[in-house]
From Swiss-Prot:
<dbReference type="Pfam" id="PF00411">
    <property type="entry name" value="Ribosomal_S11"/>
</dbReference>
<keyword id="KW-0699">rRNA-binding</keyword>
<dbReference type="InterPro" id="IPR018102">
    <property type="entry name" value="Ribosomal_uS11_CS"/>
</dbReference>
<dbReference type="GO" id="GO:0006412">
    <property type="term" value="P:translation"/>
</dbReference>
<comment type="similarity">
    <text>Belongs to the universal ribosomal protein uS11 family.</text>
</comment>
<dbReference type="InterPro" id="IPR036967">
    <property type="entry name" value="Ribosomal_uS11_sf"/>
</dbReference>
<keyword id="KW-0694">RNA-binding</keyword>
<dbReference type="GO" id="GO:0019843">
    <property type="term" value="F:rRNA binding"/>
</dbReference>
<keyword id="KW-0687">Ribonucleoprotein</keyword>
<keyword id="KW-0689">Ribosomal protein</keyword>
<keyword id="KW-0934">Plastid</keyword>
<dbReference type="InterPro" id="IPR001971">
    <property type="entry name" value="Ribosomal_uS11"/>
</dbReference>
<dbReference type="GO" id="GO:0005840">
    <property type="term" value="C:ribosome"/>
</dbReference>
<keyword id="KW-0150">Chloroplast</keyword>
<dbReference type="GO" id="GO:0003735">
    <property type="term" value="F:structural constituent of ribosome"/>
</dbReference>
<dbReference type="GO" id="GO:1990904">
    <property type="term" value="C:ribonucleoprotein complex"/>
</dbReference>
<protein>
    <recommendedName>
        <fullName>Small ribosomal subunit protein uS11c</fullName>
    </recommendedName>
</protein>
């Protein structure tokens, strides 16, 4: 029988990165938090789905809080102390994610909203009727 080779997990080496960038993408169905260094290389990430939530509960503020805490604690272990926050989207987990990043121990330097707004571009989807 052929030998099975297991891929070893890549260990995050602790370097004193100092400053990082937190990207929060908040949609109505999910919240994704990615922490990168200043050049854009991913250090840690978490989403509501990867934090154990399924279905409609992924879009809740509590799920966003859990995902942000998970990513922030992971980034703290690699040596990041201060962050700039870039928020994209209009989901319900925006403010909660920012608060939980601050509560995890990361110092926030700036918060920017980079939600893309069309200058009357594509036609929107059909309106939802309830």
């Amino acid at each position: 029988m052929a030998q099975k080779f297991r891929k070893q997990a890549v260990k995050k080496n602790r370097t004193n990165l100092g400053t990082g960038v937190v990207h929060i993408q908040s949609t109505f169905n999910n919240t994704i938090v990615t922490i990168t260094n200043m050049s854009g290389d991913t250090i840690s990430w978490a989403s509501s789905g990867s934090s154990g939530f399924k279905g409609a509960r992924k879009g809740t503020p509590f799920a966003a809080q859990t995902a942000a805490e998970k990513a922030a604690l992971d980034a703290l272990s690699t040596g990041i102390k201060t962050v700039e926050i870039l928020v994209k989207g209009q989901g319900s987990g925006r403010e909660t994610a920012i608060r939980s990043i601050e509560g995890a121990g990361l110092e926030i330097l700036s918060i920017q909203d980079i939600t893309p707004v069309p200058h009357n571009g594509c036609r929107p989807r059909k309106r939802r009727r309830v």
